[in-house]
Amino acid sequence: MASGGAFCLIANDGKADKIILAQDLLNSRISNIKNVNKSYGKPDPEPTLSQIEETHLVHFNAHFKPYVPVGFEYNKVRPHTGTPTLGNKLTFGIPQYGDFFHDMVGHHILGACHSSWQDAPIQGTAQMGAHGQLQTFPRNGYDWDNQTPLEGAVYTLVDPFGRPIVPGTKNAYRNLVYYCEYPGERLYENVRFDVNGNSLDEYSSDVTTLVRKFCIPGDKMTGYKHLVGQEVSVEGTSGPLLCNIHDLHKPHQSKPILTDENDTQRTCSHTNPKFLSQHFPENSHNIQTAGKQDITPITDATYLDIRRNVHYSCNGPQTPKYYQPPLALWIKLRFWFNENVNLAIPSVSIPFGERFITIKLASQKDLVNEFPGLFIRQSRFIPGRPSRRNIRFKPWFIPGVINEISLTNNELYINNLFVTPEIHNLFVKRVRFSLIRVHKTQVTHTNNNHHDEKLMSALKWPIEYMFIGLKPTWNISDQNPHQHRDWHKFGHVVNAIMQPTHHAEISFQDRDTALPDACSSISDISPVTYPITLPIIKNISVTAHGINLIDKFPSKFCSSYIPFHYGGNAIKTPDDPGAMMITFALKPREEYQPSGHINVSRAREFYISWDTDYVGSITTADLVVSASAINFLLLQNGSAVLRYST
């Protein structure tokens, strides 16, 4: 075994290095400490690392402190009151178990669901789209309205997968069912924490949505989606695909743009063929020689690369299915003591208090939706030269009856902490006074054109930051066929539908004067659709006592730049362009230590105003503001109260 060679650390002694490293100070301290230790007669005069770290950081020296013994376990609690059905309230009592309680997560299982069987319609003469006309579909030879003649039109019934259905058949089809996006977030409409009848904090599903948009880190998003019932895409790949490499620096390359007049005038040097061959060796080796010889430079004009495509698909709760299996949800609570173990509530300080978590559950119609189970297929032959056959589809949707979804395994998992009796007694005897952060939320309706201003009367106490969004009323309307998708988005959502036409057959035109014999096409039954969220706030302003704190800032500044710059790893830039953040703290959510606020209890004339081209008398919206407010929790006499209530 070889011995290590001598190693010499070379230190630069420039002016900047003297300031950053302070090597002279370090040498002087080591010498002084040695002299002092020798004067005291210590057998080992060398300084300790802790003495060195009084002035210099030692990167390779780890530290630890002894810690107070602590243990924890999760305890399951059943509802104290309330019927466990969708649309009701459930109240969970927090038992006197353990010395502290910290994390809490709700567990529920939504039962299987499906839609009812329906009879297939028949062909008839009734006008399509007429109110109450639900029995007949268009007759052959007429357009979709069943009134305008259309030569060659033939109609049949198919299911969402193109399989034929016989008209007039009893119990011929049923609609597919699917869950809304993030059903775990929507399930908890409101969550409240009470002690001895005093509400200490509460929040709504809008707050949960905004926390996810701004605060759930990307590396934990997959796990979060699994918990709240949001499907996660699965990656698939194609087989190998052969690609031609196009390099504008390579000679004899075919023109990518026929009208590029500068193509023959380029003065850049040609790429070395050996360089390209090293990166794209596919046409340098054949099947027999691949891997057996060195890459040989070639001068051929074509270089090849073998790749494969990546595809994504989903099959979770948001995918329409005839039968949705039971769905297990795990929903984390968002009170201050749930987020930070340093703020765990000492249960021993409230020995006789009644501690409750009350949850208002969403109704079934907000969670589950139907997808059309029947489509009308129009096949049209158009004679002539060229002759054409076009196939188009339109959904035939009549709402069915979804079975009542059961709600089972309703449990609240409470993380209880245990400490030694000595520490236990300290918390029993001492009055506890701690800084906490609670939710303050205001939802205000607006229908003013172009500009509006709202007084934030529901906000109070010192505010560190606010999450803000303007949500169109249409997003949660029962009339919106996509409300299952739009309910949590702070903007107007439009659908970008891919061109649905595929060419089934195109005859070859072999003479300039002749038309092709046929040209046929077929559309998708359900075309690929991409939702696009359009932010509806152009500019936003914040004023207090008539002083502009934010004066007509573009919405992108608050939706992208503020969360990008502030908050470190605790805040992320949301995907939703309509979700905005305004902070009065330098380090929002980063540290327990406050770093800035505005006390809206003192500045009561606190307004938010905005400009918009969307909102009007018909296109109304709701302004949602979720603020982090500072208060103080006082634990004494067996109860817990907030220091400030107004």
From Swiss-Prot:
Membrane topology of the entry: Peripheral membrane protein
Q: What disulfide bonds does the UniProt entry report for this chain?
A: none
Induction annotation:
Expressed in the late phase of the viral replicative cycle.
**Gene Ontology CC, one term:** host cell endoplasmic reticulum membrane
What does the UniProt keyword field contain? Capsid protein, Host cytoplasm, Host endoplasmic reticulum, Host membrane, Host-virus interaction, Late protein, Membrane, Viral attachment to host cell, Virion, Virus entry into host cell
Q: Where in the cell is it found?
A: Virion; Host endoplasmic reticulum membrane; Host cytoplasm, Host cytosol
Q: What's the main place this protein lives?
A: virion
Taxonomy, superkingdom: Viruses
UniProt keyword annotation of Iron-sulfur present:
no
GO biological process: one example: symbiont entry into host cell
Q: Single GO molecular-function term?
A: structural molecule activity
Sorted alphabetically, which InterPro entries does this protein's record hold?
MCP_C, MCP_C_sf, VP_dsDNA_II
Spell out the subunit comment. Homotrimer. The membrane-bound form, but not the cytosolic one, assembles into large complexes. Interacts with the minor capsid proteins M1249L and p17; these interactions form a rigid zipper structure that stabilizes the capsomers.
Physiological role: Capsid protein that self-assembles to form the pseudo-hexameric capsomers of the icosahedral capsid. The capsid is constructed of 2760 pseudo-hexameric capsomers and 12 pentameric capsomers, with a T=277 symmetry, about 200 nm in diameter. The capsid encapsulates the DNA-containing nucleoid, the core shell and the inner membrane. Plays an essential role in virion assembly. Involved in virus attachment to the host cell.
Give the protein family: Belongs to the NCLDV major capsid protein family.
Q: What is this protein called?
A: Hexon protein p72
